[in-house]
Amino acid sequence: MTRRNEKEEVPPQGKILDLFHPGIAPYAELMRIHRLLGFYLNTSPYLVGVAFSASISSTKIPIAVLLHRAMLLSIWSIFLRSAGCVWDDLIDMDLDSQISRTKSRPLPRGAVSPSNALLLTVALFACGGTVLIFLPWACTVDCLIVTFFALSYPFGKRFTDYPQITLMNIGWAVPMAMHSLGLDPLSQMTPTVCMFLFIGSVIIMIDVIYSRQDTEEDLKVGVKSMAVRFRDSIQLLSYSLLCASTGFLAMAGVLTGLGLPFFVLSVGGHFCGFWVLLRATQVGKSSGVESYAKYNMPKQAFRPRPETSCATWLLSTSRNEMGRA
């Protein structure tokens, strides 16, 4: 089979993409409209930022104002996420064409031209930027910061083992939410930094888990990432990020004087939820991590298996690391 034939991939089918006209569907796919989890991951930090702002404000903020800001920031995040996906695919087109999971995307298979993808990126950023009309000027600066790092991300995987660090820009949702409500992040600098680091470490952890499925092919193609760099200790990295993110969230609660419900529901819920996810992704073959987690997470989370317990795993990992040293 020739290389040309290998690249002739069938586009993904799904209930959401089937709703679009065949001429528009590739653009919807490029924007990841059919991947709803991505919208949640990009929108929830802004909602968390609004809730955090309301909890630390010295004056009570009307619920109508909170809902209004949450709506505007959610709209911005939706356009930001779609624009980032299109831009990332445009820059990575040559790399995606060499990886089995991504070579059927619209740009590698020729369903969308690079020029149209660039125009779509600009249009999406412009549409998202329209919400700034209804927000304080400081939010425009926040928007520019987030956009800069979103545009930088796809270049990082060519030059550094830590491109996921740029994804921490999603944590800038916290100061942007504070600015949208007229609060000064510098007045609560330490807890704000903790919330920024909390969201940033969660995003890095999720991306590392997701990137793991392409590790073998990334090595061949030359794509750099933390999943590739720490491929021999990926679980140690994941659990470390989980502990760090939990610590940052708890510290923010301590510094702002939040009550017991916050620590039980928010901090405890975060730790337990991602603990379940990490246990579900402890599989032998990295290529199956995504589907394995999706279909087997409940079973693997509560199934007692000594070989996947955290203590046993940490001991074995530490022993292996010391042996390599």
Swiss-Prot record:
- State which residue ranges cross the membrane: 47-67, 71-91, 117-137, 163-183, 189-209, 236-256, 258-278
**Topology in membrane:** Multi-pass membrane protein
Q: Which biological process terms from the Gene Ontology are attached to this UniProt entry?
A: terpenoid biosynthetic process; ubiquinone biosynthetic process
What reactions does this protein catalyze?
3,5-dimethylorsellinate + (2E,6E)-farnesyl diphosphate = (3R)-3-farnesyl-6-hydroxy-2,3,5-trimethyl-4-oxocyclohexa-1,5-diene-1-carboxylate + diphosphate + H(+)
Checking InterPro entries in the record gives: Prenyltransferase (IPR039653), UbiA_prenyltransferase (IPR000537), UbiA_sf (IPR044878)
Q: What is its main location?
A: membrane
What is this enzyme's EC? Answer: 2.5.1.-
Domain of life where this protein originates: Eukaryota
Required cofactor(s): Mg(2+)
User: Mind listing the GO molecular function terms for this protein?
Assistant: 4-hydroxybenzoate polyprenyltransferase activity
> Known Pfam families for this protein?
UbiA
* Protein keywords: Magnesium, Membrane, Transferase, Transmembrane, Transmembrane helix
Record GO cellular component, one term: mitochondrial inner membrane
Q: Does the keyword Membrane apply?
A: yes
The entry's localization annotation reads: Membrane
Q: In which pathway does it act?
A: Secondary metabolite biosynthesis; terpenoid biosynthesis
Query: Belongs to which family?
Result: Belongs to the UbiA prenyltransferase family.
Q: Tell me the function of this protein.
A: Prenytransferase; part of the gene cluster that mediates the biosynthesis of andrastins, meroterpenoid compounds that exhibit inhibitory activity against ras farnesyltransferase, suggesting that they could be promising leads for antitumor agents. The first step of the pathway is the synthesis of 3,5-dimethylorsellinic acid (DMOA) by the polyketide synthase adrD via condensation of one acetyl-CoA starter unit with 3 malonyl-CoA units and 2 methylations. DMAO is then converted to farnesyl-DMAO by the prenyltransferase adrG.
Q: What is this protein called?
A: Prenytransferase adrG
Query: What organism is the protein native to?
Result: Penicillium rubens (strain ATCC 28089 / DSM 1075 / NRRL 1951 / Wisconsin 54-1255)
